[in-house]
Amino acid sequence: VHLTAEEKALVTGLWGKVKVEEFGGEALGRLLVVYPWTQRFFDSFGDLSSADAVMGNPKVKAHGAKVLQSMGDGIKNLDNLKGTFSKLSELHCDKLHVDPENFRLLGNVLVCVLARHFGKDFTPAAQAAFQKVVAGVANALAAKYH
């Protein structure tokens, strides 16, 4: 993904303030609530019957944290997102059969979560930079799809 030096500084500066467990659980939880068809990939997570159940589900929180840890790896390797996400792309494509559109949806939800937590610090320039990053990550995760 191509970011200017200013965009990279915005992304890395804000990412350093991300509370991975909290924001990750919230982002994945919101995805599962707003786009309920994505729940089919999480059958083993137990109770996803309501928004409260999803948002309080410890497996959702744990997997959300894992997702954001991977996102952090991507942010450290913005010039090689495809390489960084190669194994995860393979896993989600070949074994889990996740619709790659879900990566885009989660990226957009994550941007909303960041905006909610960072308020005024999440400037229009920061949002634009993060939109580029989540689009790049979604494309990298979709790379192994045929």
Curated annotation (Swiss-Prot):
Gene Ontology biological-process annotations: hydrogen peroxide catabolic process
Residues recorded as bearing Phosphothreonine in the entry: 12
Tissue: Red blood cells.
In-chain residues carrying the UniProt-annotated modification Phosphoserine: 44
Organism: Erinaceus europaeus (Western European hedgehog)
Source superkingdom: Eukaryota
Presence of the UniProt keyword Transcription in the record: no
Chain positions with S-nitrosocysteine modification: 93
InterPro entries per UniProt: Globin, Globin-like_sf, Globin/Proto, Hemoglobin_b, Hemoglobin_oxygen_transport
PANTHER family (alphabetical): HEMOGLOBIN FAMILY MEMBER, HEMOGLOBIN SUBUNIT BETA
Modified residues (N6-acetyllysine): 59, 82, 144
Membrane-crossing residue ranges in chain numbering: none
Protein name as it appears in the record: Hemoglobin subunit beta
